[in-house]
Regions:
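N-terminal glycine-rich phosphate/pyrophosphate-binding loop and immediately adjacent elements
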Residues: 1-113, 117, 122-126, 130-133, ...
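Glycine-/small-residue-rich beta->alpha transition segments that form the dinucleotide
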Residues: 268, 272-277
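Conserved small/polar residues in nucleotide/adenosyl-binding loops
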Residues: 282-291
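Core beta-strand elements of the Rossmann-like FAD/NAD(P) dinucleotide-binding domain
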Residues: 4-6, 260-268
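Conserved beta-strand-loop-beta-strand element in the redox core of flavoprotein oxidoreductases
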Residues: 242-262
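Glycine-rich nucleotide phosphate-binding loop and flanking beta-alpha elements
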Residues: 17, 40, 239, 276-278
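Conserved redox-cofactor binding core of oxidoreductases
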Residues: 73-74, 100, 112-237
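Short amphipathic alpha-helical face segments that pack within enzyme cores
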Residues: 19, 127, 219, 277-280
C-alpha cells in the first residue's frame, strides 16, 4: 500500500524527534512520525505492583535483550565494552531514563583543542544555548541556579529535594575539598504544565506512573499531536529507506500495525532512532551506496 506524500517523515518518537516535531510543526507543514513501539500504559509501570523490583529488572529492563518486548529488537553486545540501554515506544529512552539532565559544557564542544582527543564540534555552546533554554522550559527542568563551574542559566523550576544518599555523597566531597553541585533534573518539583509535582513514588528508571518525570511522551508528544498537520503512527516498523537517483532519502518501506507492507514518501526524512537504530537504518536503503 502506498501512502500520500507528506512534507516531513520522522522515524522514531523519542526525545530528538519530539523536539524536532515541536519546532517544525510551527511551519504549517504535514508531519508524520512512525514509531515501532506503543504508547505506554502507566498502569503497567513497576511502581504499581508489590514485586516492582522483579518487573523492573525483567519487563522494564533497560536492555532489549532482557526485556524482549515484541516491539524490541535484539542487539549483539559481545564485542562491546558497554551495554545498550534503550526503549522502543512513544518517549523512547526517556521512558526508562532517570531524569538526569545536565547541559553539555562549553569545553565539551572543543575536546580536540583542549584535550587532544576526538574532534571539535563545528558549533559552540553559545550556538545551542537558546535551544537548551527552550528545551528546559518544554521539559520542565528543576535545578539549583548558581553553579560557578558552568555558564549561568535560568531554570523553570526549583531543585528536587536531595535524598539521604545525595547528602552523604555531598558530605564526602566537602571533606575532600571537591566542588560539587546538584544536577539539573527533568523531574518537576512543582505542579507544572498540567502535571503534578514529584512525590517520590518510585525509582525514576522504571517509568513514572505519576507523570512527574519528564519523559517526552508526556512533556512533548501530547502537545505535538494537538497541532495541525502532525500525525503519529505506532507499531510501525521501518524496513528500508528509499532514496532517489541522487542518494537522497525520499521515503520508507514499513510494516504497519497489521503487518501490511506500506510505502510512505516525503520531501524530508528524519531518522531519530537512538545511536543504534539510526545507524542501522542508514544501511537499509533501496540500493547500494558508498557511505561509510
Amino acid at each position: 500500500m502506498d501512502n500520500n506524500l507528506v512534507d516531513i517523515l520522522v522515524i522514531g518518537a523519542g526525545a530528538s524527534s519530539a523536539a524536532a516535531v515541536s519546532n517544525l510543526s510551527s511551519l504549517g507543514v504535514n508531519i508524520l512520525c512512525l514509531e515501532q513501539g506503543d504508547w505506554m500504559n502507566t498502569n503497567e509501570y513497576p511502581s504499581n505492583f508489590k514485586n516492582w523490583q522483579t518487573i523492573r529488572d525483567q519487563q522494564f529492563n533497560q536492555s532489549p535483550n532482557i526485556r524482549k518486548r515484541e516491539t524490541d529488537y535484539p542487539i549483539n553486545e559481545e564485542d562491546s565494552e558497554i551495554e545498550v540501554a534503550n526503549f522502543n515506544g512513544v518517549g523512547g529512552g526517556t521512558i526508562l531514563y532517570s531524569g538526569h539532565f545536565p547541559r553539555m559544557k562549553p569545553s565539551d564542544f572543543s575536546v580536540k583543542s583542549l584535550d587532544g582527543v576526538g574532534e571539535d564540534w563545528p558549533i559552540s555552546y553559545k550556538t545551542l544555548e537558546p535551544y537548551f533554554a527552550q528545551n528546559d522550559i518544554n521539559m520542565g527542568v528543576s535545578g539549583l541556579k548558581g553553579d560557578p563551574a558552568i555558564p549561568e542559566h535560568e531554570l523553570p523550576l526549583p531543585p528536587i529535594a536531595m535524598g539521604r544518599m545525595g547528602e552523604v555523597i555531598g558530605q564526602g566531597f566537602n571533606k575532600l575539598g571537591w566542588h560539587w553541585w546538584p544536577s539539573d533534573t527533568a523531574i518537576i518539583s512543582e505542579d507544572y504544565d498540567g502535571r503534578a509535582k514529584c512525590i517520590n513514588l518510585s525509582p525514576c528508571n522504571s517509568g513514572c506512573s505519576q507523570g512527574a518525570k519528564s519523559s517526552v511522551d508526556v512533556a512533548y508528544w501530547h502537545k505535538n499531536l494537538r497541532k495541525r498537520g502532525v500525525e503519529l503512527k505506532t507499531r510501525c516498523r521501518v524496513r528500508e529507506i528509499l532514496v532517489d537517483e541522487k542518494d537522497r532519502a525520499k521515503g520508507v518501506i514499513y510494516y504497519d500495525e497489521n503487518g501490511v507492507e506500506c510505502r510512505q514518501f516525503a520531501e524530508i526524512v528524519i531518522i531519530a532512532c537512538n545511536g543504534i537504530g539510526t545507524v542501522s537504518y542508514t544501511h537499509l536503503r533501496a540500493h547500494e551506496t558508498r557511505y561509510d
